[in-house]
Every structure is written in structure tokens, then in C-alpha cells.
């Protein structure tokens, strides 16, 4: 049965020649089990869809092992023959997905198959028709197990069903389709453990406003759509709810003059958007499931809106739940990377910015080899200097180290013009003037003795004969100014014998 499910439709397949399921693929599983035969209408419908694959009977015979393994490139679309669903099928096929289209009646899917066959895709490996699978699935009447079999191993489920606008007199239409059928699909998707569920509802499902609230005149359709949203949120499945604006009047060319706007829930109560733009948004959500994880978005189109990527607009919408961490894929035989040893960052910024480093003080030059031999005085000074000039660790510098020239503390050694004028130093008297003063006949010996006592040093020690020659200036001004010298008292003459 699984081989027959994957085989292309043919009137005479090699292993199922004459089988009713091969000749009449559009018959449902329930009809085949009753032994229903093929009609001329069913065979004529095959001429319009020779390349489509039908999984109506094969889905029921799928093994549990095939259900447990989900295929990320396989999408199940409920309402694939509708305005949004048919465009979503084509958009998914353009992006490289395989689509399993769930329809009520396979006869009505012929136009969908023809539109898919006319697509032009970049991938020449498989034709667009080979990526489409038609499966009959009535969400209102079939049991949950049949719906799970129809979903199969699809990883993504898209629900774009809704009550028909033509049956406006059907009072129970919004309840049966917008709520009950959607709820049945949600429960089946939960049982099938799909990875993402995309639900298309409408503006105003959670906010009362004009003109969206006028849709509730159609037998409370917004209230039932809100009940379907609550059922999906409470199921625990990863979901994305799309609330588009009015899609009745805009055509596919609407996107050429109106840019798509993706907003947070309960932002708009009115607006227009085309079916094609909503289908492109659904395909973008399926391609970026982690970005659209558990989000409720509203979609309208405006002429004044900027043209922004849909992925960026989805990323700005807050999520209802935190997405799970991505699993780490570790290949067999792959050695773990070695930890990178990070060098310590220096505290000084001068290592990175050399131009900011302040100028260093000039280093003293070592003495040349032709320097004169140090005297005993220099050796003693060097010994005391070695004790004072110790390093930061307290180790004294040995005498054997070369004597370094100390930097002078005064700036006058480099800048002579800043040096203040020095006070005039008195010139020492000559030896002739000192001898004339001491040999003057007018000076009595007592005055000379008193002068010697007065001309003493600061500590009271009388000046000796050797120190008298080194005396700088006499204390008496009479040596220079004779006219100021007072008259000396007459010296008595010695008596003559």
C-alpha cells in the first residue's frame, strides 16, 4: 500500500493492474472499503490531472513507523481549494516544499492541479506536479484517526478553512466549519504531533471595533473563530495565528501598489489585504518557524507602508511562549574544539595607543672608559650614595655598578635665561693693604690687640695669623676712609735719660 501511495497515478500501474484504487484515485477510503466502482466522471477527471498523486487510500494504510518520523519539507493544507489555500499551495511549491492538499472532494481539485502544473520553478529535478499530493479529508464528518492518517508525516499543518459566503442563510455554518472543523483538525494535529500549526482567522476576533465587528452579523463568525484560536492556544502545539483584513475585493495585483504590514494582535479593526499576500505570509511563516513561534499577527496592506522584509516584521512581534533551545548537532568522529587561550588584557592603554604614551625621561649615559680614576673623596661619596640609592625592593646598589649621572633638580642648568641674578660677592683685600694697616705707626698696640679680639669668627675663636691673610674685609671703615678717622689721643713720649 505504501508503494502504491508514492506511485504516480496511472490507469494501469505495473503491480496494481485493474485495481479500483489505481484506476479511481479520487475515491475516498470509505468508498473503496464498501467496494464502490469507478464512474466515467472519475476517469474523465484523471485527464485533467495526470501527474498528481493521491493519498486517499494509502494514508489509512500508513504504518506507525512512518507517522512518527516527520518530514520538514511536507506541509498539510486544509482548505486547499479555497482562495487563500490554493495560492498557499503554489507558494509552498515555489519554495521547494511538498504539499499534501486536504480537500473534501477530489473532483474539485482538478483546477488546483492544473494551476500547479503551470508553475515555473528553479529546481529542475522534480516537476511542480510531483510535489503535490491530493488527499480527501472531511474535517466535519471523519473520525480523528482518519484525519491523523490524512496528515501523515507532515511537519506543518495549515488551516485556511471558513464558512462560505454564498451560504449566508446557513445559520450553523460558522459554528460547524470555523469552530468544530478547526477544532477537529487541532486535535488530530496534536495526536499526530506536528511541529507547527498555522491558523488563518480574521481581524476583530478579540477586539470589538468597526467595521470588522460587522462580520458577527454573519451568525457570529468572529466569536466562533475566537473559540478556534483558544482551542489551538490551549492544545500546546507550536502555532502561529494570522488575522488578515478584508480579502474580498483586492486582486493579486493589489500587492504592486500596497505593501504588506504585519502587526501585533488587536492593532487593527479594519483594512484590506489580498489573498496572495496572505498566502505569501503563510509560506514565510513556515520557512521561519522559530521566528514565528507562538505568535498572533495581523496582516493588512497599505500604500503608505514601507516595503520591509516579512521576516523582519515577524521578528518584531512578541511571542506568547519562549521557543525551545535549538538542539546541538554533533557529528560522529568530530573532535570537540580546543578551548582558545585568551591572553590577559593589559591595564595600561599605552600598549594599544603608542601615540598617547607620555615622553619618558632621558636615560643617563654610562661613563666612558677614559674617565679619570676616582679619588679617595669620590670613593667615600660613592659609598654613601650606594646606601641611599637603593632599589624599590630595598636591595642597595653595589659600588661595582657604574656610577649613574643624577639628574639636577634645578632647571637653571638647561635654561640659563631663567637664572636669577646673583648677589655681588665682596672682593678680598690685597696683602699690601693689610700690611699697611697693620704697620701703621698711628695704630697703638692696644688697638691692634682689640682689633684682633674683635675680628674673630662667629664661634668666638680669635683669628690666627694664617687666618688673618684669608680675612675678606676689615671690620673698621677707617682703613678706607682716613678722613673719618677720629683723632687719636696723644701718646706720651718716653722720658729722656
Curated annotation (Swiss-Prot):
<keyword id="KW-0520">NAD</keyword>
<comment type="subunit">
    <text>Part of the Tic complex. Interacts with TIC110 and TIC55. Interacts with LFNR1 and LFNR2. Component of high molecular weight thylakoid LFNRs-containing protein complexes containing LIR1, LFNR1, LFNR2, TIC62 and TROL proteins.</text>
</comment>
<feature type="compositionally biased region" description="Polar residues">
    <location>
        <begin position="388"/>
        <end position="408"/>
    </location>
</feature>
<keyword id="KW-0472">Membrane</keyword>
<keyword id="KW-0677">Repeat</keyword>
<keyword id="KW-0809">Transit peptide</keyword>
<keyword id="KW-0813">Transport</keyword>
<dbReference type="InterPro" id="IPR044719">
    <property type="entry name" value="TIC62"/>
</dbReference>
<feature type="region of interest" description="Disordered">
    <location>
        <begin position="310"/>
        <end position="497"/>
    </location>
</feature>
<keyword id="KW-1001">Plastid inner membrane</keyword>
<dbReference type="InterPro" id="IPR036291">
    <property type="entry name" value="NAD(P)-bd_dom_sf"/>
</dbReference>
<keyword id="KW-0793">Thylakoid</keyword>
<comment type="function">
    <text>Involved in protein precursor import into chloroplasts. Part of the redox regulon consisting of TIC32, TIC 55 and TIC62. Acts as a membrane anchor of LFNR1 and LFNR2. Has a NADPH-dependent dehydrogenase activity, but only after preincubation with lipids.</text>
</comment>
<keyword id="KW-0150">Chloroplast</keyword>
<feature type="repeat" description="3">
    <location>
        <begin position="474"/>
        <end position="495"/>
    </location>
</feature>
<dbReference type="GO" id="GO:0015031">
    <property type="term" value="P:protein transport"/>
</dbReference>
<feature type="binding site">
    <location>
        <begin position="75"/>
        <end position="104"/>
    </location>
    <ligand>
        <name>NADP(+)</name>
    </ligand>
</feature>
<keyword id="KW-0521">NADP</keyword>
<keyword id="KW-0653">Protein transport</keyword>
<feature type="repeat" description="1">
    <location>
        <begin position="346"/>
        <end position="367"/>
    </location>
</feature>
<protein>
    <recommendedName>
        <fullName>Protein TIC 62, chloroplastic</fullName>
    </recommendedName>
</protein>
<feature type="compositionally biased region" description="Low complexity">
    <location>
        <begin position="430"/>
        <end position="458"/>
    </location>
</feature>
<dbReference type="InterPro" id="IPR016040">
    <property type="entry name" value="NAD(P)-bd_dom"/>
</dbReference>
<feature type="region of interest" description="3 X 22 AA approximate repeats">
    <location>
        <begin position="346"/>
        <end position="495"/>
    </location>
</feature>
<dbReference type="GO" id="GO:0009706">
    <property type="term" value="C:chloroplast inner membrane"/>
</dbReference>
<keyword id="KW-0934">Plastid</keyword>
<dbReference type="GO" id="GO:0098807">
    <property type="term" value="C:chloroplast thylakoid membrane protein complex"/>
</dbReference>
<dbReference type="Pfam" id="PF13460">
    <property type="entry name" value="NAD_binding_10"/>
</dbReference>
<feature type="repeat" description="2">
    <location>
        <begin position="408"/>
        <end position="429"/>
    </location>
</feature>
<feature type="transit peptide" description="Chloroplast">
    <location>
        <begin position="1"/>
        <end position="55"/>
    </location>
</feature>
<feature type="compositionally biased region" description="Low complexity">
    <location>
        <begin position="370"/>
        <end position="387"/>
    </location>
</feature>
<feature type="compositionally biased region" description="Pro residues">
    <location>
        <begin position="359"/>
        <end position="369"/>
    </location>
</feature>
<feature type="compositionally biased region" description="Polar residues">
    <location>
        <begin position="459"/>
        <end position="476"/>
    </location>
</feature>
<dbReference type="GO" id="GO:0009570">
    <property type="term" value="C:chloroplast stroma"/>
</dbReference>
<feature type="compositionally biased region" description="Pro residues">
    <location>
        <begin position="487"/>
        <end position="497"/>
    </location>
</feature>
Amino acid at each position: 500500500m505504501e508503494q502504491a501511495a508514492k506511485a504516480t497515478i496511472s490507469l494501469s500501474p505495473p503491480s496494481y493492474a485493474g485495481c479500483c484504487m489505481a484506476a479511481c484515485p479520487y475515491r475516498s477510503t470509505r468508498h473503496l472499503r464498501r467496494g464502490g466502482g469507478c464512474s466515467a466522471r472519475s476517469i474523465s477527471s484523471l485527464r485533467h490531472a495526470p501527474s498528481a498523486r493521491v493519498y486517499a487510500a494509502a494514508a489509512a494504510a500508513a504504518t506507525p513507523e512512518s507517522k512518527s518520523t516527520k518530514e520538514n519539507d511536507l506541509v498539510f493544507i486544509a482548505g486547499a481549494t479555497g482562495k487563500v489555500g490554493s495560492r498557499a499551495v503554489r507558494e509552498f511549491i515555489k519554495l521547494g516544499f511538498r504539499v499534501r492538499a486536504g480537500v473534501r472532494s477530489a473532483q474539485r481539485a482538478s483546477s488546483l492541479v492544473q494551476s500547479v502544473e503551470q508553475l515555473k520553478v528553479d529546481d529542475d529535478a522534480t516537476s511542480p506536479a510531483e510535489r503535490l499530493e491530493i488527499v480527501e479529508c472531511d474535517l466535519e464528518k471523519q473520525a480523528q484517526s482518519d484525519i491523523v492518517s490524512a496528515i501523515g508525516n507532515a511537519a506543518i499543518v495549515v488551516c485556511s478553512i471558513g464558512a462560505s459566503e454564498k451560504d449566508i442563510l446557513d445559520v450553523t455554518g460558522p459554528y460547524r466549519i470555523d469552530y468544530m472543523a478547526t477544532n477537529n483538525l487541532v486535535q488530530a494535529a496534536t495526536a499526530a504531533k506536528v511541529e507547527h500549526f498555522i491558523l488563518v482567522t480574521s481581524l476583530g476576533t478579540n477586539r470589538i471595533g468597526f467595521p470588522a465587528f460587522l462580520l458577527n452579523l454573519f451568525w457570529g463568525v468572529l466569536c466562533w473563530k475566537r473559540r478556534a484560536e483558544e482551542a489551538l492556544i490551549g492544545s500546546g502545539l507550536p502555532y502561529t495565528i494570522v488575522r488578515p483584513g478584508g480579502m474580498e475585493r483586492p486582486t493579486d495585483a493589489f500587492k504592486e501598489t500596497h505593501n504588506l504590514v504585519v502587526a501585533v494582535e488587536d492593532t487593527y479593526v479594519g483594512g484590506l489585504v489580498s489573498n496572495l499576500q496572505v498566502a505569501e505570509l503563510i509560506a514565510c511563516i513556515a520557512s521561519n518557524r522559530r521566528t514565528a513561534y507562538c505568535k498572533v499577527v495581523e496582516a493588512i496592506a497599505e500604500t503608505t507602508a514601507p516595503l520591509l522584509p516579512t521576516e523582519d516584521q515577524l521578528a518584531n512581534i512578541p511571542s506568547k511562549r519562549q521557543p525551545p533551545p535549538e538542539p546541538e548537532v554533533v557529528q560522529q568522529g568530530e573532535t570537540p574544539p580546543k578551548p582558545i587561550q585568551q591572553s590577559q588584557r593589559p591595564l595600561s592603554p599605552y600598549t594599544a595607543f603608542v601615540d598617547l604614551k607620555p615622553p619618558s625621561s632621558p636615560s643617563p649615559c654610562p661613563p666612558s672608559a677614559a674617565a679619570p680614576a676616582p679619588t679617595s673623596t669620590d670613593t667615600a661619596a660613592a659609598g654613601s650614595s650606594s646606601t641611599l640609592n637603593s632599589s624599590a625592593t630595598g636591595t642597595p646598589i653595589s659600588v661595582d655598578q657604574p656610577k649613574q649621572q643624577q639628574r639636577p633638580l634645578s632647571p637653571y642648568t638647561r635654561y640659563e635665561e631663567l637664572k636669577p641674578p646673583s648677589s655681588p660677592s665682596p672682593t678680598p683685600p690685597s696683602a699690601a693693604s693689610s700690611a699697611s694697616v697693620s704697620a701703621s705707626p698711628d695704630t697703638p698696640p692696644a688697638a691692634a690687640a682689640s682689633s684682633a679680639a674683635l675680628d674673630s669668627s662667629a664661634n668666638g675663636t680669635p683669628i690666627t695669623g694664617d687666618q688673618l691673610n684669608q680675612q675678606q674685609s676689615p671690620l673698621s671703615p677707617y682703613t678706607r676712609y682716613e678722613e673719618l678717622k677720629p683723632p687719636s689721643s696723644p701718646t706720651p713720649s718716653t722720658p729722656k735719660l
